Amino acid sequence: MMSGEKKELVFKKIGIAIAFSPRLEALIAEAAKMQVGLKSEMIFIHVGNKSEEDVKTINEYLEKYNLLNNSKLIWQEGETVETILNICNEEQLDLLVAGALEKESLIKYIMGSVARKLSRKVKCSMLMLTEPKIESSPLKSIVVEGSNNPKTENTIAVAIEIAKAFKVKNVDVIQETDLNKAVLIRSDEFKENEVAKHKENLIEEEDKRLNYILSCNDCGDIKINIDRIEGKPGYIISKYAREHHADLLILNSPDRKLNLIDRVFPTDIEFALADLPCNLLLVNIKEDYTA
């Protein structure tokens, strides 16, 4: 049951995982935009050997984007994924940001890239940027999951907060409804002529749930569009985001830690991770880092 209680939505502490790649400056530029929009504390994380020249390079970019004196740089050696996860825990991050390729080779996807490994293990929310940009590029379109899940209330609230912070005018809330599957599971309870009515009842329940969630949020001038799409959850919302040229897709974080089997036999979230349609935000209700 949804409580209707307002949760703390602001990403107060954001970690940016950076590496010496062609995307370095673009990731720092994106961090600067986030700091302006969300008023967050920014922590840059680099795993690798430390040299004066490398420190100078990063500091020059931080200064260029007015982040040198109001951000923190953590530089550690170790295995990349585990080191970043440990820093997330130590710093009690609300959001981790990393660059990610839209699509990877099958072998690399199954074995796991750094960004995708982090997304499956991190306790906080995670933003995967497919095309970080140096130049200012307005956020125009957000697609957010509206599934029947205890996390969805918080996820939609976060989507609305981000839309307000970056002056996004349109937010699409997508109900991925596998109605045939839902009816099949309970088909023994209904006669053949009752199946259609049961589908209607399921749709009505979903509409009431989403309307309740939206009524608990101050949407301001944002236009909320609710669409119901019947199909495989995870896959169908990614397809929708791509076809509608969304700038940001926002999903609930996985309900459990994902493993190799989930990549070979994809779960809902793995459909999105396999072929990112745009920037992807996985919203997690922040866990106790001491657990």
Question: What does each of the following model-derived ranges do?
Answer:
Residues 54-62, 203-211:
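N-terminal membrane-insertion helices
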Residues 1-2, 85-135, 240-291:
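Gly/Ser-rich helix-loop-strand patches that form or flank binding pockets
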Residues 2-57, 64, 69, 141-193, ...:
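Small/aliphatic-rich secondary-structure junction motif
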Residues 43-45, 72-76, 127, 172-174, ...:
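General small-molecule cofactor/ligand-binding pocket signal
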Residues 1-9, 33, 50, 60-96, ...:
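Structural beta-alpha unit
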Residues 19, 50, 76, 102, ...:
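Structured loop/turn residues at secondary-structure junctions
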Residues 193-205:
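A short acidic, glycine-rich active-site loop
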Residues 24, 77-78, 108, 152, ...:
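A conditional alpha-helix N-cap/helix-loop micro-motif detector
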